[in-house]
Amino acid sequence: MIFTRERFKCHQGVMPIPCPHFKITIVKRSQGQSAVAGAAYQSGERLFSEYDQKTKFYNKKKELVHAEIMLPSHAPPGYADRATLWNAVEAVENQWNSQLARRIVLAFPVEVPKEQYLKMIREFCQEQFVAKGMIADFAIHDKGDGNPHAHILLTIRAMDEHGKWLPKARKDHDL
C-alpha cells in the first residue's frame, strides 16, 4: 500500500481510495520549533532536549495507538531511542536557522479497517524513506472521533553505509 499526496493504492486488487489529508512541513529552528518536541508530541513520551535543556512532554495526548522508529540497516542501533535520535539531529543541525526534520501528517481513509493502519504506515515509511537512508519516526493517533491519522517525523539528512550523517541533499526528495 502506497500513500501519495492524492491517494494511496492497495495492491490487493482494491480500488485506489483518496487520502483525505496529507500535509508535509519542515521543522525549523528559526521558528522556535524543535525536533525533540515534535517527537515528544507524536509519541506521548517525555523527552529531554539537550539543545534548550528542557523536558518536552504532552500529557494530554490520549489518542496514541502505536509509535515506532524505523532505521535503515546501517544506522547506529542507538538511534532506535527517540531522545538519542532527535538530540543527535539537533546537534548536527547547529545553525540558528537550521531545518531539523520533515513532518508529515496523513489521515487514514475511514474505509480502511483499523487493523491495516500499522501495516500501511510501515510499508509507506520503508518504501518512501527508510529505503532511501532516512530515519522515520511515526505514530498512529485515533481518538475514535472519525479522524484516524499518522504523524511521521523524518530526518532531513540521510545516513551513509557507515551510519554517518550525509550532507543535506540539494534536491527534492520524491515525497
Language model regions located:
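N-terminal nicking endonuclease/strand-transfer module with a His-rich metal-binding environment
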Residues: 1-175
